[in-house]
Amino acid sequence: MLKPSLPFTSLLFLQLPLLGVGLNTTILTPNGNEDTTADFFLTTMPTDSLSVSTLPLPEVQCFVFNVEYMNCTWNSSSEPQPTNLTLHYWYKNSDNDKVQKCSHYLFSEEITSGCQLQKKEIHLYQTFVVQLQDPREPRRQATQMLKLQNLVIPWAPENLTLHKLSESQLELNWNNRFLNHCLEHLVQYRTDWDHSWTEQSVDYRHKFSLPSVDGQKRYTFRVRSRFNPLCGSAQHWSEWSHPIHWGSNTSKENPFLFALEAVVISVGSMGLIISLLCVYFWLERTMPRIPTLKNLEDLVTEYHGNFSAWSGVSKGLAESLQPDYSERLCLVSEIPPKGGALGEGPGASPCNQHSPYWAPPCYTLKPET
């Protein structure tokens, strides 16, 4: 036997939510009263209001800096449109469970992106509750619970000093602006020969010893700290301290620099040799050949004493060097005995006179042609 079908009005009532139309709904307010939120209507709800109200709010990240102040920030650019989100906070199950509004907002491009809490508002060992809310959509909110002792970031260590304990041992000391027993430290050091750092963990003591050092090397040290493990379980380290150096400034050269210098010297030497060879061949082509004593006699014999033939001097230059006069030989003899005549005869030439000195040659000009 067939069951009677549902009335048409019942089917329509069941399909109304699927068609996106509203019904008369009520919700309970915190004081227990009923609050009517919508009346029965047969129109479609705006899709943009649905999408905005269902979008998740950005996550809030809080960090306590050296227990002096705390910043809670969020990514304001993740919103579909610029929105000044508001932040409320309180401490769970404590005397400070009263809801507080943020009194000091941080801004990014004139949009709220964080909140800063001062030292008096920070209670490390109480559960911190933070609530982010969209003021345009009060029901759009997100709540997080945080343990602040795990979110502490100390300041970087300060006043690094080095002491030489012995001929080959160094001790590094530093200071922190927080209780030393709450911090652990990480020391890094390297020499000017090293390409990477060597790390060494140090407990709450603020000193580190290096048992063996090389006086010919230059050492660099730096330190950072973390709020762990006695007072909290923070995972974030502080910034690195300013580095401190020890050792000779004239240490051995870096192997890489030594290899680079060797290559530069080799290439420079080869370039110099090639340049000298080029200059030598150029001079050999442009300068006249100068014979050695061994083959000078052979050259004179081969070229019949013609210097210009084998020296490379041009014919025009050789002709211009020819003299334009002729020489007459002058005979010089020894001084005659006393009483002898100075001349051999009445027509004797001065060139034939006897003189204790060398007589210059006599010249006669060639007749002009």
Swiss-Prot record:
Q: Might you report a single GO cellular component term?
A: cell surface
Q: Which residues form a coiled coil?
A: none
- Listed Pfam families: CRLF2-like_D2, TSLPR_D1
Enumerate the Extracellular topological stretches: 23-262
Main localization is membrane
Report the record's Gene Ontology biological process terms: CD4-positive, CD25-positive, alpha-beta regulatory T cell differentiation; cellular homeostasis; cytokine-mediated signaling pathway; gene expression; immune response; interleukin-15-mediated signaling pathway; interleukin-2-mediated signaling pathway; interleukin-4-mediated signaling pathway
Q: Which residues are glycosylated?
A: 24, 71, 75, 84, 159, 249
Fibronectin type-III domain location = 156-253
Q: Which residues carry this modification: Phosphothreonine?
A: 292
The disease tied to this protein in UniProt is: Severe combined immunodeficiency X-linked T-cell-negative/B-cell-positive/NK-cell-negative: A form of severe combined immunodeficiency (SCID), a genetically and clinically heterogeneous group of rare congenital disorders characterized by impairment of both humoral and cell-mediated immunity, leukopenia, and low or absent antibody levels. Patients present in infancy recurrent, persistent infections by opportunistic organisms. The common characteristic of all types of SCID is absence of T-cell-mediated cellular immunity due to a defect in T-cell development.
Name the PANTHER family on file. Answer: CYTOKINE RECEPTOR, INTERLEUKIN 2 RECEPTOR SUBUNIT GAMMA
- Subunit annotation: The gamma subunit is common to the IL2, IL4, IL7, IL15, IL21 and probably also the IL13 receptors. Interacts with SHB upon interleukin stimulation. Interacts with IL9. (Microbial infection) Interacts with HTLV-1 accessory protein p12I.
Q: What is this protein called?
A: Cytokine receptor common subunit gamma
At the highest ranks, the source species' classification is: Eukaryota, Metazoa, Chordata, Craniata, Vertebrata
Task: Give the encoding gene's name.
Answer: IL2RG
